C-alpha cells in the first residue's frame, strides 16, 4: 500500500466514525424532543457519508482502471467504519421517526 492509498483510506475511517457519532447524537436529541437538532445531526451524518463515498469511489475507480490497489487491514477497517456509519444513519432515521410519533401522544 502506498502513501496515496493510505491517504484515501484514512478519511473513510474518519468520516464513517463521524457519521456514526452524528447519528447517535441525532437519536439522543430526538429522545429529548429536540427534533430540529436531530435533523441537524442527521444532515451532518449524511454529509460525512457522502464525503466517505467520494474516497471509496476513488479507490474503486483505481481498481477498475487496472491500477493495483492492495487490500490491507486498513482498507477492511475503513470499509467496516463506512458500512457501520451507513447502518447507524439508516437506523437513526427510523428511531427519530418513532420518537416523533411517540411525542404526538
Each predicted region: which residue ranges?
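Terminal alpha-helical segments
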Residues: 1-105
Amino acid at each position: 500500500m502506498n502513501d496515496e492509498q493510505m491517504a484515501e483510506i484514512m478519511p473513510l475511517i474518519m468520516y464513517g466514525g463521524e457519521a456514526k457519532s452524528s447519528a447517535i447524537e441525532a437519536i439522543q436529541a430526538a429522545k429529548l424532543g429536540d427534533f430540529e437538532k436531530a435533523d441537524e445531526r442527521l444532515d451532518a451524518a449524511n454529509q460525512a457519508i457522502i464525503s466517505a463515498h467520494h474516497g471509496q469511489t476513488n479507490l474503486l475507480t483505481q481498481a477498475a482502471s487496472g491500477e493495483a490497489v492492495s487490500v490491507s487491514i486498513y482498507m477492511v477497517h475503513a470499509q467496516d467504519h463506512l458500512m457501520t456509519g451507513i447502518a447507524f444513519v439508516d437506523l437513526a432515521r427510523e428511531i427519530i421517526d418513532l420518537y416523533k410519533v411517540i411525542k404526538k401522544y
